Design a protein with these regions (language model features):
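A short hydrophobic beta-strand segment most commonly corresponding to one strand
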Residues: 41, 87, 102-114
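Structural motif
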Residues: 66-68, 93, 103
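Asparagine-centered strand-capping/turn motif at beta-strand->loop junctions
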Residues: 98-99
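Short, conserved beta-strand element in jelly-roll/cupin
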Residues: 40-44, 54-69
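A short, N-terminal "cap"/entry segment at the start of jelly-roll beta-barrel domains
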Residues: 1-35
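Conserved short histidine dyad/triad with adjacent acidic residue
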Residues: 24-27, 37-54, 90-91
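Short beta-strand segments in beta-sandwich/barrel cores
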Residues: 48-50, 65-71, 85
Length: 114
């Protein structure tokens, strides 16, 4: 077991993300987790992530605020509020945007590639 406190985690720059701060809470280097990692993303108003797809599974869980998931052309946007979550399967594309004027905080769980 390894406890992690918010004070000890360090921010990192998530690729293709903007106007946000990412914190890695658990992972190989942080706690020895071998199959997945967990992070916390703080999105400023109009912050988000560019459209991207990867072969990894993702779970997003909104703690505070609101984020909009944009699955791509012709697909309906999905808005997540506090305590809402979404599973994004391998190779499913998505963009993320905080369309509000309030910050949003989201937990992120992603598996490591095999």
């Amino acid at each position: 077991m390894k406890k992690v406190t918010l004070q000890e985690v360090k921010p990192y720059q998530a690729p293709k993300h903007f106007n946000m701060v990412a914190l890695r809470l658990h992972g190989k280097e942080e706690t020895g987790a071998q199959r997945f990692w967990m992070g916390m993303s703080h999105f400023l108003p109009q912050g988000g992530a560019e459209y991207d797809a990867s072969p990894l599974e993702k779970i997003y869980f909104v703690l505070e605020g609101e984020v909009t998931i944009q699955p791509g052309p012709g697909k309906e946007e999905i808005t997540l509020g506090p305590w809402d979550s979404i599973y994004i399967g391998p190779n499913e594309g998505r963009a993320i945007i905080n369309k509000t004027n309030r910050p949003a905080t989201m937990l992120v769980v992603i598996n490591y590639p095999d």
